[in-house]
Swiss-Prot record:
The chain crosses the membrane at residues 26-46, 64-84, 96-116, 137-157, 178-198, 217-237, 252-272. It comes from Macaca fascicularis. This is Mas-related G-protein coupled receptor member E. One of its GO terms (cellular component) is plasma membrane. The keyword GTP-binding does not apply.
Length: 311
């Protein structure tokens, strides 16, 4: 081998080693963020399901936390073979199950975020109509319908693109993934439109302090999705529709997806925290949800208790 060719081979080997090291760093960060996200979403799920007063928007966040929890669990398990550099490999049906379950939870979380954005926008634009005419069980029905529709799409994709229910159909599989791509685009546009209208309504509202709680939470969650959650959806659709994407986008989208799911509980607790005061997590989450009436009742009860003790 000539010296020039030897140098080229050595340079290629060094570049490959650097790529492997970089990918390992990204995957390790993804695992760490996923673990933090599991703890954060687990805390949100526990607080919303047991201790915190359930306003309509709390039910949305309860379902979002559940979807994120399942997504992160599958996400962390799915990247273990890449992290261990081929020393461990899952059977094909396990890899397929993890992949389809991740996309299912991703679409559920996005659909719920769209639903809560639209409902918060309606509450800001038409407060009188919303408070008087809103169906009592609207949130529960929307959440149940979202899970059911996403499950139907999940089963159709599994039946057409995998061997779970028989021989896969390439034509039907590609058609369903195109439907999923259109669905993702429609959901993103609807969410952005509702969030923009909500932002304009908050800015143009009467002369009063802007709401620190739930509207701000929704706007931050939407921004978080656009910058961190959307790359995973783009990667997943491109992969299944056989569109060309850069190789580095694979690990990048996995990292940003972990950031997206792990950062949402941080946003909840940061928005609900009181500057200069340490509050229980239950009250912090209530403040983020805008349960001012419930918080007032809690404070009044606390004051009465102190008075009774003093007496």
């Amino acid at each position: 081998m000539e010296p020039r060719e030897a140098g080229q081979h050595a340079g290629a080997a060094d570049g490959a080693q650097e790529d492997v090291a970089f990918n390992l760093v990204i995957l390790s960060l993804t695992e760490g963020l996923g673990l933090g996200g599991l703890l954060g979403n687990g805390a949100v799920l526990w607080l919303l399901s047991s201790n915190v007063y359930r306003n309509p928007f709390a039910i949305y966040l309860l379902d979002v936390a559940c979807a994120d929890l399942i997504f992160l669990g599958c996400h962390m398990v799915a990247i273990i073979p890449d992290l261990l550099q081929g020393r461990l490999d899952f059977p094909g049906f396990v890899q397929t199950s993890l992949a389809t379950l991740r996309f299912f939870c991703y679409i559920v979380g996005l659909s719920l975020l769209v639903a809560v954005s639209v409902e918060q926008c309606l509450a800001a634009l038409f407060p009188a109509w919303y408070s008087c005419r809103r169906p009592r069980h609207l949130t529960t029905c929307v959440c149940a319908l979202t899970w059911a529709c996403c499950l139907l799409l999940h089963l159709l994709l599994s039946g057409a693109c995998t061997q779970f229910f028989g021989e896969p159909s390439r034509h039907l599989c590609r058609t369903l993934w195109l439907v999923a791509a259109v669905l993702l685009a429609v959901l993103c546009c609807t969410m952005c439109g509702a969030s923009l209208m909500l932002l304009l309504q908050v800015e143009r509202g009467p002369q009063r302090p802007p709401p620190r709680g739930f509207p701000t939470l929704i706007l931050l969650a939407v921004l978080l999705f656009l910058f961190c959650g959307l790359p995973f959806g783009i990667y997943w659709l491109s992969r299944n529709l056989l569109w060309h994407i850069p190789h580095y986008f694979y690990h990048f989208s996995f990292l940003t997806a972990a950031v997206y799911c792990a950062a949402k509980p941080v946003v909840y607790f940061c928005l609900g925290s009181a500057q200069g005061r340490r509050l229980p997590l239950r009250l912090v989450l209530q403040r983020a949800l805008g349960d001012e009436a419930e918080l007032g009742a809690v404070r009044e009860t606390s004051r009465r208790g102190l008075v009774d003790i003093a007496a």
